[in-house]
C-alpha cells in the first residue's frame, strides 16, 4: 500500500434544487464525541500497482457497502495535515445511508495500552447539504466541495442549462 496516498469518492445527489454530498463519520471511541471536522469522503489506501480511481471505487464499496457507477469526475488531489495526499473523484448517485455496511479495522485502544479492538471504518454515513458539509468535513477535504461545485457549474454552462 502506498503509505502517504489514498483515493476516494465524493458521492453527490440533488435533493430538489439542493446539492448534497455523502460523508462518513469514523468509527471507534476516539471519534465517538467528535463531529465538526471529523467527517470524511469514503477513501483509503491505494494498493501497489492499483490505479488510483480503481482504489477509490474499491474503498468506497469497502467503507460504505454501496457500489458507485460512473461517470467519475476528477477532483484532483489535496494534502491533509498529516501529509497524506488524497486523490478524489466525484460521482452522482444515491443510496440509503441507514444501510451502511462498513469494513472493520483493528486499532489499539486506549492508545499505548497494547489492547486492540475492532471498529468500523465508518460508524455512520449521511448526506449533507453543501453548507453543512463544509462544517462537518475534514478541513483539508473542504477544497473538494469547492471543486465539485466548480465542475457542476462548468458542466451546466457547457450544456447551456444554468442553475439546476
Task: List each language-model region with its residue ranges.
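Alpha-helix-centered segments that form part of catalytic cores
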Residues: 115-131
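Active-site-adjacent beta-strand/loop module that shapes the phosphate/pyrophosphate-binding cleft
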Residues: 78-114, 126, 148
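Short, basic, low-complexity termini and linkers enriched in Ser/Thr/Gly/Pro
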Residues: 153-164
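The catalytic Nudix box helix
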Residues: 40-75, 129
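A generic structural signal for short hydrophobic patches within well-formed alpha-helices
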Residues: 46, 133-134, 145
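N-terminal strand-loop-strand
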Residues: 1-40, 89
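C-terminal/domain-terminus segments
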Residues: 141-155
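Short, charged/polar surface micro-motifs in flexible loops or helix N-caps
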Residues: 15-18, 28-31, 47, 66, ...
Amino acid at each position: 500500500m502506498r503509505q502517504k496516498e489514498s483515493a476516494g469518492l465524493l458521492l453527490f445527489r440533488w435533493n430538489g434544487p439542493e446539492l448534497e454530498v455523502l460523508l462518513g463519520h469514523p468509527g471507534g471511541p476516539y471519534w465517538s464525541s467528535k463531529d465538526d471536522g471529523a467527517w470524511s469522503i469514503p477513501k483509503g489506501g491505494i494498493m501497489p500497482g492499483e490505479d488510483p480511481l480503481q482504489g477509490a471505487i474499491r474503498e468506497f464499496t469497502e467503507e460504505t457497502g454501496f457500489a458507485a457507477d460512473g461517470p467519475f469526475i476528477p477532483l484532483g488531489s489535496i494534502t491533509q495535515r498529516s501529509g497524506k495526499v488524497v486523490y478524489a473523484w466525484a460521482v452522482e448517485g444515491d443510496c440509503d445511508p441507514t444501510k451502511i455496511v462498513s469494513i472493520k479495522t483493528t486499532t489499539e485502544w486506549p492508545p499505548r495500552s497494547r489492547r486492540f479492538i475492532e471498529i468500523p471504518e465508518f460508524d455512520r454515513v449521511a448526506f449533507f447539504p453543501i453548507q453543512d458539509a463544509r462544517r462537518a468535513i475534514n478541513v483539508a477535504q473542504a477544497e473538494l466541495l469547492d471543486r465539485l461545485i466548480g465542475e457542476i457549474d462548468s458542466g451546466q454552462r457547457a450544456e447551456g442549462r444554468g442553475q439546476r
